[in-house]
């Protein structure tokens, strides 16, 4: 059974910098998946429960973060990682949510929303607006 997660990105505080997507990944479990874009949204389509995707953002001030979304045991989850070094790409971060990796505990929490403030004061939030079913939706907010 396939799942999709459609993300809408909102940037509320341009003084913190404008964030652009610089990388997209999909983990290979559950037949992997794909990212697509339409009308300003980013949609992760996955082959089944048990996989995820990561978007890596960089601001025009050099701040790097990742937003991870996925489905684990038929339930959505999300995470934001801040304070990244240039070599900490989405390709590096995505597998850390699996196989007892350092971020696996976050996936297993199956959070419907998560927020964090970076060391430089930028607040990041992911909040699912459609939390059940196979066609999930979430807002990603930078402020």
UniProtKB/Swiss-Prot annotation:
Lectins can be used to recognize and purifiy specific glycoproteins, and for the purification of cells with specific surface glycoproteins. Has potential as anti-proliferative agent. Keywords: Lectin. GO terms for molecular function: carbohydrate binding. N-acetyl-alpha-D-glucosamine binds at residues 79-82, 103, 114. Coiled coil: none annotated. Pfam families: FB_lectin. N-acetyl-alpha-D-galactosamine binds at residues 49-50, 72-73. N,N'-diacetylchitobiose binds at residues 79-82, 103, 114. Beta-D-Gal-(1->3)-alpha-D-GalNAc binds at residues 30, 49-50, 72-73. InterPro entries: Cytolysin/lectin (IPR015926), Fruit_body_lectin_fun (IPR009960). Homotetramer. Belongs to the fungal fruit body lectin family. Lectin that recognizes O-linked galactose-beta-1,3-N-acetylgalactosamine, a disaccharide (Thomsen-Friedenreich antigen or T-disaccharide), present on cell surface glycoproteins. Can also bind chitin, N,N'-diacetylchitobiose, N-acetylgalactosamine and N-acetylglucosamine. Inhibits proliferation of colon, breast and liver cancer cell lines (in vitro). This is Boletus edulis lectin.
């Amino acid at each position: 059974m396939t799942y999709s997660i459609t993300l809408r990105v909102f940037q509320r505080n341009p003084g913190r910098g404008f964030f652009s997507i610089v990388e997209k990944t999909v983990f290979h479990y559950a037949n992997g998946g794909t990212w697509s874009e339409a009308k300003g949204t980013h949609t992760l389509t996955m082959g089944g429960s048990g996989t995820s995707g990561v978007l890596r953002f960089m601001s025009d001030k050099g701040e790097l973060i990742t937003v991870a979304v996925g489905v684990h045991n038929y339930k959505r989850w999300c995470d934001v990682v801040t304070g990244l070094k240039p070599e900490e790409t989405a390709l590096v971060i995505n597998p850390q949510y699996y196989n007892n990796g350092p971020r696996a505990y976050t996936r297993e929490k199956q959070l419907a929303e998560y927020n964090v403030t970076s060391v430089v004061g930028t607040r990041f939030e992911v909040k699912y607006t459609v939390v059940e079913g196979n066609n999930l939706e979430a807002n990603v907010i930078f402020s």
